[in-house]
A protein has these predicted regions:
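Anion-binding and metal-coordination hotspots
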Residues: 1-163
Length: 163
């Protein structure tokens, strides 16, 4: 795909919309990193912070899904860039390019969990679901999170989930 990947993604998005009718009433956004077992860096493959603490070059990717979890758009960025500011630009760009008007729920782990991202999501009428390690919570919050009440048990075939 190389440098032309954005054109390919656009073609695939149009084809998806033609076959499945994308639902832009709500969307979901998340970022992730991919590492490469190569020695030399490239335009996107840059050495950067890795969850696995690897020293290999990584690439960051932002993915936007519609309300039915169908891919709407994606964007890759150099792995040596912080995801925190990139996330805000990616969401704006992907929503604008794909004419997404509905609310976007940002899904993020601790790497993207910062006040600026939370405030921007709220200011834009969007939502967020940011994780936080239970191990690092103050004792009072940890006790609250680990309570057994306040959950609804949902059965999906053989799987049991607490919401």
């Amino acid at each position: 795909m190389g440098e032309e990947y954005e054109k390919l993604v656009e073609i695939l998005t149009v084809a998806t919309d033609d076959n499945f009718i994308l639902d832009s009433s709500r969307s979901y956004f998340d970022c992730t990193n991919y590492y490469f077992e190569i020695d030399k860096e490239s335009t996107f493959q840059k050495r950067g912070p890795s969850k696995e603490n690897r020293r290999d070059p990584i690439v960051g990717m932002g993915l936007l899904l519609d309300a039915q979890m169908l891919p709407v758009g994606m964007k890759i960025f150099p792995g040596n860039e912080s995801e925190k500011p990139v996330m805000r630009d990616l969401i704006h760009d992907l929503k604008s390019r794909n004419n997404i008007k509905g609310r976007t729920i940002q899904i993020a782990d601790k790497g993207l969990n910062c006040a600026k991202n939370s405030i921007e999501a709220i200011d834009n009428g969007d939502g967020y679901l940011f994780s936080k390690s239970v191990k690092t919570l103050p004792e009072r919050e940890r006790q609250w999170v680990l309570l057994d009440d306040g959950f609804e048990t949902v059965f999906q075939s053989e799987r049991r989930t607490r919401l």
